[in-house]
């Protein structure tokens, strides 16, 4: 299969790009992935609670609902959405080549690619984490918080930013109490989120505290968490039936490692004010190239930019035989 433009991703950036490209009659193909990077189609927004700061929704909207609406809108204009994960790409020459996880030896081609793969939640890899992962440990409170093993139990959230505050607030609906562990002596969360968290009757925030080890019961479920005060070195074992990580994200750039220029943290480098990457014809949008803002609205904005950049690129190169275009010479020249 050959396409003028392929979008890899399923979040606000990917679907906004798809909407613009489909309306421009460029017939975009969007690979939303099948649990790509361990995240369901829709990206990080599917793991959040109510979104209060996305324009157009004065009463707020749930993350999953917002992504469902974006997907429906991109499909309405003709975007072809494929629920497969792109496993490898070859950006050395145009048309670019790529293959999916389910058919790794069957290559497809595209004149341009928009990378909107987002970022994935970090894990601490504590002793016992692998054993009790999804048996008490999660990186998504919205996905897992309502399951029976967490109801009316003491739950722990690790992190000090807005995500941690949001996850903890969400978990108060189900847990008997929520303890938030913050490595430093203050929260990084915004003032409004910090105020809500610190004043919630079902939340306790423990500063200068880290997780050390996860322990479980004879049923194979998490039952305790060993924590340590980093100022005194004193350890304590907490009874806890749930542990939720909210400690940041890593950009999903393994797919293009060694082919696109990335920064020290692994984020794709784009030319300032654009979504152009180090390879002509490849564009990056959303959290995969944004480590500063990481908001749904900014992701959508860069998705729009990527679509317009791709449309301009395609119009300028439609007369050039794609099979003779070697992209290696332009790599790294931002």
Curated annotation (Swiss-Prot):
Cofactor binding note of this UniProt entry: Binds 1 FAD per subunit.
Gene Ontology biological process: cell redox homeostasis; removal of superoxide radicals
PROSITE patterns: PYRIDINE_REDOX_2 (PS00573)
Keyword DNA repair: no
Entries under InterPro entries matching the protein: FAD/NAD-bd_sf, FAD/NAD-binding_dom, Ferredoxin-NADP_redctase_2, Pyr_nucl-diS_OxRdtase_2_AS, Thioredox_Rdtase
Substrates-to-products reaction catalysed: [thioredoxin]-dithiol + NADP(+) = [thioredoxin]-disulfide + NADPH + H(+)
One Pfam family hit: Pyr_redox_2
GO MF term set: thioredoxin-disulfide reductase (NADPH) activity
Chief localization: cytoplasm
Disulfide partners: 140-143
Keywords from the named record: Cytoplasm, Disulfide bond, FAD, Flavoprotein, NADP, Oxidoreductase, Redox-active center
A GO cellular component annotation in the UniProt record: cytosol
UniProt-annotated binding residues for FAD: 10-13, 39-40, 44, 53, 86, 143, 287, 294-296
Top EC group: oxidoreductase
Localization: Cytoplasm
EC number: 1.8.1.9
Family: Belongs to the class-II pyridine nucleotide-disulfide oxidoreductase family.
Other remarks in the entry: The active site is a redox-active disulfide bond.
UniProt-listed NCBIfam families: TRX_reduct (TIGR01292)
Protein name: Thioredoxin reductase
Species name: Neurospora crassa (strain ATCC 24698 / 74-OR23-1A / CBS 708.71 / DSM 1257 / FGSC 987)
Gene: cys-9
């Amino acid at each position: 299969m050959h396409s003028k433009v392929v979008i890899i991703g399923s979040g606000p950036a990917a679907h906004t790009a798809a909407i613009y490209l489909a309306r421009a009659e460029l017939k975009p193909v969007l690979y939303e992935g099948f649990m790509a990077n361990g995240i369901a189609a829709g990206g990080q927004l599917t793991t959040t609670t109510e979104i209060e700061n996305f324009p157009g929704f004065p009463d707020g909207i749930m993350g999953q609902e917002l992504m469902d609406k974006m997907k429906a809108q991109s499909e309405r204009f003709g975007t072809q959405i494929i629920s497969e994960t792109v496993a490898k790409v070859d950006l050395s020459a145009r048309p670019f080549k790529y293959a999916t996880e389910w058919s790794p030896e069957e290559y497809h081609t595209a004149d341009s690619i928009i990378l909107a793969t987002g970022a994935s939640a970090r894990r601490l890899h504590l002793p016992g984490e692998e054993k009790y992962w999804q048996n008490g440990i999660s990186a998504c409170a919205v996905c897992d918080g309502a399951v029976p093993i967490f109801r009316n139990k003491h739950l722990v959230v690790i992190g000090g930013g807005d995500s941690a505050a949001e996850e903890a607030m969400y978990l108060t609906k189900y847990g008997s109490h929520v303890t938030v562990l913050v490595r430093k002596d203050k929260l990084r969360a915004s003032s409004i989120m910090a105020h809500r968290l610190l004043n919630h009757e079902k939340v306790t925030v423990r500063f200068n505290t880290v997780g050390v080890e996860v322990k479980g019961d004879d049923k194979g479920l998490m039952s305790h968490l060993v924590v340590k005060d980093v100022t005194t070195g004193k350890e304590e074992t907490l009874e806890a039936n749930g542990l939720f990580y909210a400690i940041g994200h890593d950009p999903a750039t393994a797919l293009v490692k060694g082919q696109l220029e990335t920064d020290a943290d692994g984020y794709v480098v784009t030319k300032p004010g654009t979504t152009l990457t180090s390879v002509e014809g490849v564009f990056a949008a959303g959290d995969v190239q944004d480590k500063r803002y990481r908001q749904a609205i900014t992701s959508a904005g860069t998705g729009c930019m990527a679509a317009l950049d791709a449309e301009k690129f395609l119009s300028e190169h439609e007369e050039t035989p794609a099979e003779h275009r070697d992209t290696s010479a332009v790599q790294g020249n931002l």
